[in-house]
């Protein structure tokens, strides 16, 4: 007998409708009356705060200092470095009038310019280097086709901006942060990934090198989930950021930037959610345990016991206590929609038997657990929960990754929703043709081939220079 699912939409049949429904019924956000803007509801914001907590631990170990910079950028400053911010021009929010001032201002689409202005005015000599800064903030980019978390006109992120004495130091730190992102996405968020370098056509225009982390959604589309950029001296020369060296001469700094945004919440939802609702890895789940009274919410002894359990387990887990008179079915449904890792139910008869009903989010199987064994049961659940999530996601991931030798194969596999690995000559001309013909873009270079390679490019038949992934993307 098939049980009715909590959602009307099926993730397998129509992931777009499913995504819209699961976000709404999971109470993560509220749509604003301004296109592309949304309010984070408490559970949605809690996820972002938990992501922030995990990443901040890593940043603190690297002596990255947190600060906060202004939201407005002078349009004159923006035009000064327009070529390095290419791609933002058509999607800017511009403040056209401020009191009697004639100069226009831009709501930041990113903060390289703000950091450059700060460093130019405060950096004096080599003793201040390296500078490692980070801010948690929102940025603004006009979007025509918006989806909550995946594509918003205002979104939240963290952005690291750092500067160094040498190119090697700048690149090494960019790579270190890139590897940190890979560990975070794989080990904490339980999402399989592909990592590599962006092509010249796809990298951040102001970067010498862009390192990316790409995740693959269940429909085969790629989601750029984190990037780290070696900016070399591109910004420091444009903004004249110089410091006095040990030799008493002056040199431009080398800089890098990196970031992860609330888009990663969309990746978590699409990777782990199911037709009953949201599912979250333990480190970022708003609630680990939903603890509920059933059948008799006026029973003082029962309520006292539930509060005792809530106080006990709140020392280790995030607990949602519910002593309202909801039906058992409604309690389980709401817990699954919300993405609680497990739901615990206790009624008067359970109290007499010294037991509790236990349902975990992954298996959804109902078990009766003696309260004397509940500690052990929870330990067992949370010691394997993330591993099970990752293995489930990895199984889907492996069905979406494929290889193509020829362009004909490539077209077929892209059309069927695959994340396709190919050998490629790495020339911008062909990248544009590929996008026009298939809708796929290059996602990341995973390997540079040596001169002796016998591999041929899948589209030009020229000698291949790289091994690379292409996919359609969000």
From Swiss-Prot:
SUPFAM superfamilies (alphabetical): C-terminal domain of ProRS, Class II aaRS ABD-related, Class II aaRS and biotin synthetases
Protein's cellular compartments: Cytoplasm
CDD domains assigned to the protein according to its UniProt record, in alphabetical order: ProRS_core_arch_euk (cd00778)
Residues spanning the signal sequence: none
Chief location category: cytoplasm
The entry's keywords: Aminoacyl-tRNA synthetase, ATP-binding, Cytoplasm, Ligase, Nucleotide-binding, Protein biosynthesis
Cellular component per GO, a single term: cytoplasm
EC number(s) reported in the record: 6.1.1.15
GO molecular function: ATP binding; proline-tRNA ligase activity
Matching Pfam families: HGTP_anticodon, ProRS-C_1, tRNA-synt_2b
One GO-annotated biological process of the protein: prolyl-tRNA aminoacylation
Reaction it catalyzes: tRNA(Pro) + L-proline + ATP = L-prolyl-tRNA(Pro) + AMP + diphosphate
Keyword Ubl conjugation attributed: no
Top-level EC class: ligase
Protein task: Catalyzes the attachment of proline to tRNA(Pro) in a two-step reaction: proline is first activated by ATP to form Pro-AMP and then transferred to the acceptor end of tRNA(Pro).
The protein's assembly and partners: Homodimer.
Protein family membership: Belongs to the class-II aminoacyl-tRNA synthetase family. ProS type 3 subfamily.
NCBIfam families in alphabetical order: proS_fam_I (TIGR00408)
Domain free text: Consists of three domains: the N-terminal catalytic domain, the anticodon-binding domain and the C-terminal extension.
Protein name: Proline--tRNA ligase
Species whose genome carries this gene: Mycoplasmoides gallisepticum (strain R(low / passage 15 / clone 2)) (Mycoplasma gallisepticum)
């Amino acid at each position: 007998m098939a049980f009715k699912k909590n959602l009307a939409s099926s993730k397998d049949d129509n992931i777009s409708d499913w995504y819209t429904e699961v976000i709404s019924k999971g109470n993560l956000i509220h749509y604003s009356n301004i296109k592309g803007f949304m309010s984070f509801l408490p559970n949605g914001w809690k996820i972002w705060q938990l992501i922030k907590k995990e990443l901040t631990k890593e940043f603190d170990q690297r002596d990255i200092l947190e600060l906060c910079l202004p939201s407005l950028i002078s349009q004159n400053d923006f035009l000064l470095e327009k070529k390095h911010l290419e791609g933002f021009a058509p999607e800017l929010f511009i403040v056209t009038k401020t009191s009697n001032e004639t100069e226009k201002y831009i709501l930041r689409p990113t903060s390289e310019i703000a950091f450059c202005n700060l460093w130019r005015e405060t950096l004096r000599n080599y003793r201040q280097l390296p500078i490692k800064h980070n801010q948690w903030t929102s940025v603004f980019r006009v979007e025509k086709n918006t989806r909550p978390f995946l594509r918003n006109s205002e979104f939240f992120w963290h952005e690291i901006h750092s500067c160094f004495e040498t190119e090697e130091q700048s690149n090494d730190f960019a790579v270190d942060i890139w590897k940190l992102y890979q560990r975070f996405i794989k080990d904490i968020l339980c999402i399989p990934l592909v990592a590599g370098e962006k092509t010249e056509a796809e990298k951040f225009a102001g970067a010498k090198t862009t390192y990316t982390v790409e995740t693959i959604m269940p429909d085969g589309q790629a989601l750029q989930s984190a990037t780290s950029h070696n900016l070399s001296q591109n910004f420091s020369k444009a903004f004249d950021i110089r410091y006095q060296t040990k030799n008493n001469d002056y040199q431009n700094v080398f800089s890098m930037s990196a970031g992860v945004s609330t888009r990663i919440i969309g990746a978590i939802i699409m990777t782990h959610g199911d037709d009953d609702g949201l599912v979250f890895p333990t480190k970022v789940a708003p609630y680990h345990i939903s603890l509920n009274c059933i059948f008799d919410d006026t029973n003082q002894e029962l309520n006292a016991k539930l509060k005792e359990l809530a106080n006990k387990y709140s020392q280790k887990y995030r607990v949602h206590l519910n002593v309202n008179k909801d039906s058992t079915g409604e309690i389980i449904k709401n817990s699954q929609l919300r993405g609680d890792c497990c739901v615990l139910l206790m009624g008067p008869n359970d109290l007499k038997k010294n037991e509790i009903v236990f349902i975990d989010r992954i298996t959804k199987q109902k078990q009766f657990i003696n309260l004397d064994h509940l500690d052990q049961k929870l330990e067992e659940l949370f010691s394997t929960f993330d591993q099970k999530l990752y293995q489930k996601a990895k199984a889907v991931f492996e069905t979406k990754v494929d290889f193509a030798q020829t362009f004909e194969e490539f077209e077929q596999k892209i059309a069927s929703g695959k994340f396709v690995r190919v050998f490629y000559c790495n020339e911008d001309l062909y990248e544009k043709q590929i996008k026009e013909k298939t809708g796929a873009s290059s996602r990341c270079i995973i390997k540079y081939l040596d001169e002796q390679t016998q591999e041929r490019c899948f589209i030009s038949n020229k000698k291949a220079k790289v091994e690379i992934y292409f996919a359609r993307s969000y």
